Regions:
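Small beta-barrel nucleic-acid-binding modules, primarily SNase/OB-fold domains
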Residues: 2-151
Length: 151
């Protein structure tokens, strides 16, 4: 029993809030939010996607779209881990819809090739490209990971 208690204490608190409803959500950019979960404020990075930076073309539109997906909705986080910056990594669900997927499907984020595990996201990205949705309206959109290296 003592071992189990110590094991539980060793887990990062972020991992204990899986499937927890979020409150007081504030959108930082197209792939990052701040929210309260079980009374604790956390910063959340949406996994497997990369949205344009705020100073990049479509950055503001991406942030606004994410805000519309989350505003006054029941939002749940499924934790996938934590990144090197201390952000909780996870999938967001708004009224039971996968927000990470919707960001890609409507052209407001790229599939983050380096970290993508859900191959079905590429189907939605290809569809958004074919339909010239969101950032895919631009002639040659620059992926955020390329943009960051250039700046």
């Amino acid at each position: 029993m003592k071992f189990i208690f110590l094991l539980l204490l060793s887990f990062n608190a972020a991992y204990l809030i899986s499937y927890t409803p979020l409150e007081n959500i504030r959108v930082v950019d197209g792939d990052t939010i701040r929210a309260e979960a079980k009374g604790k404020e956390i910063k959340i990075r949406l996994v497997e996607i990369d949205a344009p930076e705020m100073n990049q073309p479509f950055g503001a539109q991406s942030k606004n779209f994410l805000n519309r997906l989350l505003y006054e909705k029941e939002v749940t986080l499924i934790v996938q881990g934590e990144d090197r910056y201390g952000r909780v990594l996870g999938n967001l669900f708004s009224n039971e819809l996968n927000v990470n997927m919707l960001m890609v499907k409507f052209g407001f984020a790229w599939v983050y090739d380096e970290y993508a595990k859900n191959s079905s996201l590429y189907k939605y990205q290809d569809q958004a490209k074919a339909e010239n949705l969101g950032l895919w309206r631009a002639k040659d959109p620059i992926a955020p990971w390329v943009w960051r290296k250039q700046k």
